[in-house]
């Protein structure tokens, strides 16, 4: 088994794991305590950044969750998860993939750090970046008017990558993220068996 994915519970690793599960891929999953650079220092020998997810596929090594997910659908497809250049929604598909991390997940990383890892150090940043994240959901909420999915009238990688930000918002207690259209959309996505399985993977320390 050449394909390996390293991840932590509730991390951005959910994106490629969910993608792999939807595609029925054969892969090895290594779950670690968060953050692994602190609690599993030997991981730095595998990924010098100490970040998750990390994917190894033969000689290929990748560190970015959206890029890994896109690699999987393009390398191991064809898959309906991919929107191809000949489809009308291809530009929107690409935009949502980049939007998922650059626009949505970025402010959440600040909240995660100062709410869970270093509580009390920067409470103003937690409040400010939480508001900033919620304000950035306008486009998503509007796009989901009368839509079940983001692109091409089907479930795609765009739904996987963007919805992770909402899943993380729930974990961080940012309840304002669940606007009506977004809640309807995520209720549907998060009931998918592949997502439920992906969320169920946990680090189990050796006894």
Feature names for model-found ranges:
Residues 97-191:
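GST-like fold's C-terminal all-alpha helical module
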Residues 1-127:
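GST-like domain detector, emphasizing the conserved glutathione-binding G-site
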Residues 33-36, 158, 203-204:
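Conserved beta-strand edge residues that scaffold enzyme active sites
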Residues 73, 165-166, 199:
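Active-site-flanking alpha-helical
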Residues 182-207:
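Long hydrophobic alpha-helical segments typical of transmembrane helices together
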Residues 29, 153, 178, 198-199:
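A generic structural-conservation signal
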